[in-house]
């Protein structure tokens, strides 16, 4: 049963992500074809899949899964934003796919804005690596999949700082000097960002 539910969520995540989303051309829009395909997926779930669950009963769970896939490390969205997304979802017509896809795009736009802001902030920190305080008495969870999300932007930015500082410390403990650490982390950030910028809808659907 758990496997079948995961299959349902996978299909529904595809429905939320059907988009033509392309960070490459910076355009985020969906077409009538995407809406039609979303409706077809819903019909399959409700009428042909062996669980035959009604879409409204699992829409919130599907949106939650979409958010977790976008932000598994819980360092992009604030808790109040997650609560707002899920609350708005409860008030929507579950079968209005134009509204659902529009909301998914709005969420992805915020995700991309935050991703870029985090990248820029951490790059700046690396450019000033010699002045970083590596003796802070703060802990960071290696696995944040179950961690609490930040409650405001200030704490979110502090989390970004902590993540970068932790990466610096780990490389230093592995025997890298500051220049080597700076080079390696800068390369890592750039590679991750370049990969993100090349994302196309087909890639997102493979999540």
Predicted feature locations:
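Bacterial N-terminal signal peptides that target proteins for export
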Residues: 2-8
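Compositionally biased regions
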Residues: 5, 20-23
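Bacterial N-terminal signal peptides
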Residues: 10-16
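Flexible, low-complexity junctional segments that flank or bridge functional domains
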Residues: 22-207
């Amino acid at each position: 049963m758990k496997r079948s539910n995961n299959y349902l969520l996978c299909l529904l995540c595809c429905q939320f992500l059907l988009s033509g989303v392309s960070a490459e051309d910076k355009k985020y829009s969906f077409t009538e074809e995407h809406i039609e395909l979303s409706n077809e997926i819903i019909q399959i779930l409700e009428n042909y899949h062996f669980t035959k669950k009604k879409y409204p009963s699992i829409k919130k769970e599907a949106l939650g899964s979409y958010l977790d896939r976008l932000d598994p490390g819980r360092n992009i969205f604030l808790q109040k934003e997650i609560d707002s997304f899920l609350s708005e979802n409860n008030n929507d017509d579950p079968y209005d796919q134009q509204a659902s896809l529009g909301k998914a795009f709005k969420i992805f736009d915020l995700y991309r804005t935050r991703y870029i802001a985090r990248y820029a902030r951490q790059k700046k920190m690396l450019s000033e690596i010699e002045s970083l305080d590596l003796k802070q008495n703060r802990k960071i969870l290696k696995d944040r999949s179950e961690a609490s999300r930040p409650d405001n932007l200030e704490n979110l930015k502090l989390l970004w700082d902590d993540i970068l500082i932790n990466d610096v410390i780990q490389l230093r403990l592995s025997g890298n000097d500051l220049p080597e650490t700076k080079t390696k982390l800068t390369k890592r950030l750039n590679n991750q960002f370049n990969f993100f910028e090349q994302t196309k809808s087909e890639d997102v659907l493979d999540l």
